[in-house]
Swiss-Prot record:
The keyword DNA-binding does not apply. Keywords: ATP-binding, Cytoplasm, Kinase, Ligase, Multifunctional enzyme, Nucleotide-binding, Pantothenate biosynthesis, Transferase. Residues 1-276 are annotated as: Pantoate--beta-alanine ligase. The active site is at residue 36. This is Bifunctional pantoate ligase/cytidylate kinase. It comes from Prochlorococcus marinus (strain MIT 9301). GO terms for cellular component: cytosol. Its EC number is 6.3.2.1, 2.7.4.25. GO terms for molecular function: ATP binding; CMP kinase activity; dCMP kinase activity; pantoate-beta-alanine ligase activity.
Amino acid sequence: MKKVIIRKTEEIENWRRNINSEINFIPTMGNLHDGHIKLISTAKNDNSNVNLVSIFINPLQFDNKLDLENYPQTIDNDIKISFSNGADAIFIPSYEDIYPPNNKNIKFLKAPKELSSALCGLNRIGHFDGVCTVVYRLLNLIKPKNLYLGEKDWQQLLILKNLVLRKNLNVAIRSIPTQRDFDGIPLSSRNVHLSKNERKLISFFSSELLEAKKIFQQDKKINLNQIIKKLSAKKISVEYLEHLHPHTLQKARPEDNISLLAGAIRCGETRLIDHVFLMKRRPIIAIDGPAGSGKSTVTKLIAKKLNLLYLDTGAMYRALSWLIIKESVDYKIEKKLQNILKDISIFFKSNTNSHQDVYVNNYCVTKEIRSQKISSIVSKISSIKEVRKFLVAEQRKIGESGGLVAEGRDIGTTVFPHAELKIFLTASIDERAKRRKYDKNSKDSQEIDLYTLKELIKKRDFEDSNREISPLIKANDAIEIITDGYTIDEVVDKIIDLYNDRIPKETEIK
């Protein structure tokens, strides 16, 4: 594709009609640095869409006229950087193109107060209104499939996500982690204004935030006043330093696994922001649902794509059921059940095909536990109080450090009630029966007619939903996904999009 520079809104409309491709859009205000390069290269590597970079210094988002006048302009270098790193086209409009005079169709938007009244919004009145206005205008002109933004401006990212939802815009927001320079400070177009001494001061500010992150991981409290005192001792002017919930921007709660520590300082005439995410453990995805809803298949793929541990809790109950049958244990007699729980060892191990095998006392039972014989008894065994207490404790041990996706029937309600993302995966009984019928790993199901399979699934649903301990129910904060008519890949992509929307990319950086 021929690389082009577009300067007029009419040209952007003609170009969009002629490219015969979806668009990845990377909006910038110019003076591009390695952070922008990361955005452009990420867009290029994500898919085969056409990549469009815009360069437009938006006056509406400047609350300080001097700041606008001093904003660095390096247009020739920006063009070179954009094209050499994957841009197919560059849009460089004038103010009149974006905000044509006497055009009543231009909407000047207000940012939501619940997100814009804290942090930067306290002192930069109207800033986020200007951001919303220009991005909304650009999105309507360009109509991209994906919008690429950096997490450095986290508050702005939240506000633009809200804008997309509020205006029902058909665009997916893709974010990348804050990119830092050699001395730890976040890359910013304004860094060119810093003297050597000012840069040292900002580096100290960033290092204090990163140190707070380490302290938090050690399960220690963050002392904001102490950090502010340290900064003040260095003659650093602190505009704000807040510990907040990462999505609501309200005060962080003790039970929040992921929280935001954000600050703004001034060095000379330059104002800079920085933040870190504080995390007690890595994120957890909890996937619940009835038998045959596709939980195992979907969860395995999600674990692989997100590099998370796959915890098949249902397999643990099946493994115990297998041992009870094998040893002819009368599980209704408490003492005999306690003996088998005391001696059992259930663990998972990757095999040569990169799949996960289930072991009971060092014996691989991956295939055996999927038999109809096990299916007919596992619900009864899993409803026993002692069994659930034992296996839930084992599952929580595995999940102490997070970094996993677990599937079962009580993951989001009982095992991991504070999971960052809870999914309730389900499907119609007809659909689930068909899946069981044609499951290559279940020979027993292949030999049973569809009607009988439906009746067995109904029976299992009733038992799971009506057991006294940890019944199968949808967690209050779970997102229900009905999988009828969707491919496995579509369901997996949907859940990964939800995960990416909730979990900052920066939390993946150790």
